[in-house]
From Swiss-Prot:
Keyword list, A-Z: Calcium, Immunity, Repeat, Secreted, Signal
Compartments, as annotated in UniProt: Secreted
Catalytic temperature dependence: Thermostable.
Gene Ontology terms: cellular component: extracellular region
Protein name: Lymphotoxin beta receptor inhibitor
Source organism per UniProt: Aedes aegypti
């Protein structure tokens, strides 16, 4: 009797185990265990995070340096950048002709051109100003002209000096006091025109030309 009860309990135990595993009849339970082991494990791929670099702002001074246009050369002899403008083109023609050693036809020049050319003729350092030495040279030029005229009219008379050195010095001092309006020790072309010296020269040359 005890053996029958033990056998019944054993059968019930195996039946409970079989129902717990839910294995189909006739199928080896190890087959399911192998499938569970062979199932791939899917992992979410990790996307690498790229660091975001923020561009540093360019200093404003550096931008201005790159944006600045190339500067031109400095004006020649202190003249404005637009030297060949319509206002002084006639004067600049004589100026350029003198610098390039081009023969100048004074017969086709206006009175203003002649005045400017005469002024520039004595501007030896080409700074558009006449200093004391250049004024003396201009006076010597007048002096030589007078000597030449006197020698042509009186060929038999001996050569004589019209102005002494002291007279030339006094004349230069007088001209400076009369023409040097701003007192800088120079006579520029504007001061020359305002002084009325060209009127005296026009009296010496009625035709307006030497």
């Amino acid at each position: 009797m005890k053996q029958l009860a033990l056998l019944t309990l054993t059968l019930l135990y195996f039946a409970a185990v079989a129902l717990g595993q839910r294995v189909a009849p006739g199928v080896n339970p190890g087959h399911y265990q192998q499938q569970q082991q062979q199932q791939p494990q899917y992992q979410q791929p990790q996307v690498p995070v790229q660091p975001q670099y923020q561009q540093a702002p360019v200093p404003q001074q550096q931008q201005q340096q790159h944006q600045q246009p190339p500067q031109g050369h400095a004006p020649h002899h202190g003249q404005p950048q637009q030297v060949l403008n319509a206002n002084n083109i006639q004067q600049e023609k004589a100026h350029i002709a003198e610098h390039m050693d081009v023969p100048i036809d004074t017969s086709k020049m206006s009175e203003q051109e002649l005045q400017f050319h005469y002024f520039k003729m004595h501007d030896s350092d080409n700074n558009n100003k006449l200093d004391g030495c250049e004024l003396i040279k201009s006076l010597i030029h007048w002096h030589d002209e007078e000597k030449h005229k006197h020698a042509e009219k009186n060929p038999d008379e001996p050569d004589k000096t019209i102005y002494t050195d002291e007279q030339l010095e006094n004349i230069v001092d007088s001209v400076m006091r009369m023409m040097d309006a701003n007192g800088d020790g120079y006579v520029d072309y504007a001061e020359y025109r305002r002084s009325g010296v060209e009127e005296n020269r026009r009296d010496d040359y009625p035709n307006g030309r030497p």
